[in-house]
């Protein structure tokens, strides 16, 4: 940790965005070592004064769960778990060339307090009410700003797209109860959308179907990307030269007004010369050619027991009576779950570890950035795609972001949320429609 950010440096960092656990600051100063960088800083929950819900310190059970992975426990002691988990664990599954762990930098007293005040007016009100920068922290994670290219040629615009793809497959686990068999036919994303609509968290259910994006079919990838423009929510954001031009800043955006979509498309067209159809083709081609979603899907599929199976192994790990089994009356299901409870500890840990890695993969985002390739360039460090409609080649890079380890004790939350989502959809079907109607476009294809 050689780099130190001092109080006077706070003015050079501006608001870029935030999620539940971290806030992102973008550098606007003149230091060559900081240009093209963002700072990922921890937040605390205002009502509890506790760190936001991510895993920064391991419990004794987590130490045993993750202890066999070299370097991971040591990273907790050095306060660099997010960096280590991304580079040691997730890069094995997603590819080291698509994972940027960043570097830990020290921060002097008052830096975060000043930075927090400076960005206050830029943060969504609901985020401000819920959380704040952890002013007591003494370090942060410095990462490349993947909405930009390093050393971008003069006059060349960079377009970056952030996609939170969510779970891209339908589970087939034998541990899913008959009452919840709808999970094998309808995507978790779609079912959750209807619960969110019912709770008033969104004003319109999304048209996006993760199965389209992960299908490997160019036509269906086109459909998925097109759907983002009418209902981006927190799944889709576009940046031009590092500045957000479409989508929400705080990860909680609802629908975008049609006028905003039109303005975004006008801005895109002005700086890139691309019409919407060109842009969708460019993004689709890069997703298809890079193969990154194939790696993401394979990582998500490490969850082969579903939460309805994995929750029982969680109770094995914490050596507590299974609270789920207490409420089950189905004899056949109890027999299956008894088999899980008889597994040795190392097998239970392997299944839960894979489940948590999968949970990170289901919740992370993919950042794909583009810039026009200079004519005559043959030795670029980046891959490229050629867009026939504008007769232009584009450099592109793809990185996964938000690769934090999920806390072990969140297993109970995952189970309860899963049951809540499925129970609501089973009772109500598609909100606003006839629950007896078959789900539209969500069954196996």
Curated annotation (Swiss-Prot):
Cite the binding residues for substrate: 127, 166, 196, 234, 363, 406, 410, 414
- One Pfam match, by short name? Ins_P5_2-kin
Q: Where is this motif: EXKPK motif?
A: 162-166
Asked if the record carries the keyword Ribonucleoprotein, the reply is no
What Gene Ontology cellular-component terms does the record carry? nucleus
Q: Which GO biological process categories is it annotated with?
A: inositol phosphate biosynthetic process
Tissue specificity, in the record's words, reads: Highly expressed in embryos and at lower levels in roots, leaves, flowers and anthers.
EC id: 2.7.1.158
Gene induction: By abscisic acid (ABA).
What GO molecular functions are on record for this protein? ATP binding; inositol-1,3,4,5,6-pentakisphosphate 2-kinase activity; metal ion binding
Q: Which InterPro entries match?
A: Ins_P5_2-kin (IPR009286), IP5_2-K_N_lobe (IPR043001)
- Residues engaged in binding Zn(2+): 312, 322, 325, 341
What is the uppermost EC class here? transferase
Question: Is Transferase set as a keyword in this record?
Answer: yes
Q: Which residues cross the membrane?
A: none
* Cofactor: binding comment: Binds 1 zinc ion per subunit.
Recorded catalytic reaction(s): these are: 1D-myo-inositol 1,3,4,5,6-pentakisphosphate + ATP = 1D-myo-inositol hexakisphosphate + ADP + H(+)
Which cofactors, if any, are listed as required? Zn(2+)
Which parts of the sequence bind ATP? 19-22, 40, 144-146, 162-164, 237, 402
What UniProt keywords apply to this chain's record, in alphabetical order? ATP-binding, Kinase, Metal-binding, Nucleotide-binding, Transferase, Zinc
Concerning its family, UniProt says: Belongs to the IPK1 type 2 family.
The function of this protein is: Phosphorylates Ins(1,3,4,5,6)P5 at position 2 to form Ins(1,2,3,4,5,6)P6 (InsP6 or phytate). Phytate is a regulator of intracellular signaling, a highly abundant animal antinutrient, and a phosphate store in plant seeds. Also phosphorylates Ins(1,3,4,6)P4 and Ins(1,4,5,6)P4 to produce Ins(1,2,3,4,6)P5 and Ins(1,2,4,5,6)P5.
> Can you quote the domain comment?
The EXKPK motif is conserved in inositol-pentakisphosphate 2-kinases of both family 1 and 2.
Name used for this protein in its record: Inositol-pentakisphosphate 2-kinase IPK1
Organism expressing this protein natively: Oryza sativa subsp. japonica (Rice)
